[in-house]
Amino acid sequence: MEFKDKQVEVLGARTRYYDVGQGEATILIHGGGPGASGLSNYRKNIEALSAKRRVIVFDLPGYGHTEGKLKDGAIYEVLGDFTRAFMDAIGVDKASFVGNSLGGGTSLMVALRAPERVNRLVLMGTGGSQAMFSPMPTEGLMRMARFNAGDGPSMAKLKAVLELLVYDQSTITEPLMKERLEAATRSDIIDIFKRPGLDIWREDLASLKHRTLIVWGREDRVVPFDSSFILLKTIPNAQLHVYPKCGHWAQWEKADEFNALVADFLDRP
C-alpha cells in the first residue's frame, strides 16, 4: 500500500508526515538510527493500525524529509516540544503514542510534560531507560555513534548498524538500505549522542497514569531487554510483552503479531 505524504510547518521547519484512516488519533514516532524516518520504521504497520483509527506518522527534525537540525537543549525535551508543536500544527489535541527507541523516549516525555494530551502509550525498545545488567553502551549504540565518523557514512557502515536492529537479518532488504543511506546524510545522529537528557528513567515515571504497553525484543542489541524492567516497575499501569528471536525492531520483525497486539491494546475500553 502506498501512502501519500503531506507537509506542515512546525517551529519553522517543513515537516513531512502521513495521515491515514479515521477515528481516534494514534501518533507513531520513529527511532534515531542513521537514515531513520517515519515511513521506514512503520511501513509494515500503518495500514493495519489505521483500519479502526487515525494513524499519523511524521519525520522528526533532522530525519527523513523534515527540514532543519534539532534545537539546543536536552534531547527528549526538544523532541517532546517539537511533537506537541506538530500536534498543534495539524489540529490534534490528544492522541495515543507508539514510539520505537528514540521515539519511545519522546513519547514518554510528551506524557510527562503534557499528560492531558496523551491517551495510551506503546513503547518499543525505548530510549531513556537504564539497563539493569547489560554493559552499556551496547554494540548497536556504538555502531550508530561511529556512523558519521572517519570517512563518513557508507553502505557498509549502514549495513553494520541495521544488522544489529534485527534478530533475523534477512528482513533487512536492499531497498530499505538504499532508502536509509540516502536519508542518512541528513541525519542528526551524532548530535543526539552528545546531548544531555537521555536518562528519562530519572524522571517521575510513577506520576504517569496512562495505560502503557511496553514491547521488547529479547535479543535487542541496541537497547537491551533488561532496560524494560525500570519502566515496568515504575509506570503504574504498565504491562510488558516480550518477543523471542526478536531484536530492536519489534514492529518490523514481528509486524503481524505486533499489529494485532497494539490494535487490541488500543481498542480495549
Predicted regions and their residues:
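Conserved serine/cysteine hydrolase catalytic core
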Residues: 190-233, 242
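Conserved alpha/beta-hydrolase catalytic His-Asp/Glu region
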Residues: 132-138, 151-210
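Active-site loop/oxyanion-hole signature of alpha/beta-hydrolase fold enzymes
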Residues: 47, 57-98, 260
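Catalytic active-site module of serine/aspartate enzymes centered on a nucleophile-bearing elbow/loop
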Residues: 238-269
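Gly/Ala-rich beta-loop-alpha elbow adjacent to hydrolase catalytic centers
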Residues: 99, 103, 107
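Flexible "cap/lid" loop of the alpha/beta hydrolase fold
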Residues: 108-112, 119-151
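N-terminal cap/lid segment of alpha/beta-hydrolase-fold proteins
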Residues: 1-14
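Conserved HGGG/HGGXW glycine-rich cap/lid loop of the alpha/beta-hydrolase fold
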Residues: 11-65
